[in-house]
């Protein structure tokens, strides 16, 4: 049921002249070897690993790009974290009541990378700052000698010998780094604000997503239709994040990395109430972070010599 894909590509980059057209990640996968320029000062060796959990509603697609640079005194690895995190939005009767319906939905998506290897250090990552735009596009570039730099957009990579880009959509959500140190980085993609028929609403509004049909028996009808829900609530999130790590040459042959995808869930209650005149309406009540860290974590073993990737465990 689970498929592992391995893509090996060796790329050569000349030290003598920078690339006029830098190598991008979408080089044809059919080519096992691609030579860029003259000489072989840099080799980029690529691996890809896919893991899916039906239990958690998550697919991890991880690209491992080994950077072998004769002008850099360390090993380097670029990890691009892609895949899909299902929203797991659910509608149900609250504690078998007839007048209270519940909507469980993702207030936050979690993406994280961690290692405990003393010879490994996190040296760069994307995105870095809080990003509120709907469409996120950034590039991480590498120049010979261990120089990693980031560019703000997909078009800002002209001076790099090698580059890796991220691009994702986060309508009504914002991205920010929640934790970061030399061994780990954790991002949160959090609900922000929503345009509704009654105006702009904060992600913390108690009436957010509460609908207009208090006489229905179907819990789904107590909340707004799918056409009024953003994709990250209705369907899910396609992450695209990058982390770059260095490894001390001549130390350990292997290192382990834990990569986590998941979500924190809020619950909105739609409560049927009546006015003094007997008219029914729906009143919202909110439970923030009702279910947190509903995460799928996979432990990957990286071999710095053979460039093999092994899955060592998952929850």
UniProtKB/Swiss-Prot annotation:
Keywords: Cytolysis, Hemolysis, Signal, Toxin, Virulence. GO terms for molecular function: toxin activity. The keyword Lipid metabolism does not apply. Gene3D superfamilies: Leukocidin/porin MspA. One of its GO terms (biological process) is cytolysis in another organism. Residues 1-29 form the signal peptide. One of its GO terms (cellular component) is extracellular region. Pfam families: Leukocidin. Leukocidin consists of two protein components: F and S. Belongs to the aerolysin family. Leukocidin causes cytotoxic changes in polymorphonuclear leukocytes. This is Leukocidin-S subunit.
């Amino acid at each position: 049921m689970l498929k592992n894909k391995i893509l090996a590509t060796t790329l050569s980059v000349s030290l003598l002249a920078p690339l006029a057209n830098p190598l991008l990640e979408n080089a044809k996968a059919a080519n096992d070897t691609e030579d860029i320029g003259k000489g072989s000062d840099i080799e980029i060796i690529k691996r890809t690993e896919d893991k899916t959990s039906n239990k958690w509603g998550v697919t991890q697609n991880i690209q491992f790009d080994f950077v072998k640079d004769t002008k850099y005194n360390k090993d380097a690895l670029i990890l691009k974290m892609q895949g899909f995190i299902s929203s797991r939005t659910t509608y149900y009767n609250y504690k078998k009541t007839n007048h209270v319906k519940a909507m469980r939905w993702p207030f936050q998506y979690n993406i994280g990378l961690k290692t405990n290897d003393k010879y490994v250090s996190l040296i760069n990552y994307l995105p870095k700052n809080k990003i509120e735009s709907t469409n996120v596009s950034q590039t991480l570039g590498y120049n010979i000698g261990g120089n990693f730099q980031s560019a703000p957009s997909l078009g800002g990579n002209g001076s790099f010998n090698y580059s890796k880009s991220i691009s994702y959509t986060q309508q009504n959500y914002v991205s920010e780094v929640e934790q970061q140190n030399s061994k780990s980085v954790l991002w949160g993609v959090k609900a922000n604000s929503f345009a509704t028929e009654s105006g702009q609403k904060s992600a913390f509004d108690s009436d957010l997503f509460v609908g207009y049909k208090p006489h229905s028996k179907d819990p789904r009808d107590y909340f707004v239709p799918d056409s009024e829900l953003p994709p990250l609530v209705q369907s899910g999130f396609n992450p695209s994040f990058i982390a770059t790590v260095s490894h001390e040459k001549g130390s350990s042959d292997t290192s382990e990395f834990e990569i986590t995808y998941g979500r924190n869930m809020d619950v909105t209650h739609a409560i049927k109430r009546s006015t003094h005149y007997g008219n029914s309406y729906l009143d919202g009540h909110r439970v923030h972070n009702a279910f947190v860290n509903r995460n799928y974590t996979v432990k990957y073993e990286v071999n710095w010599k053979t460039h093999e990737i092994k899955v060592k465990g998952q929850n």
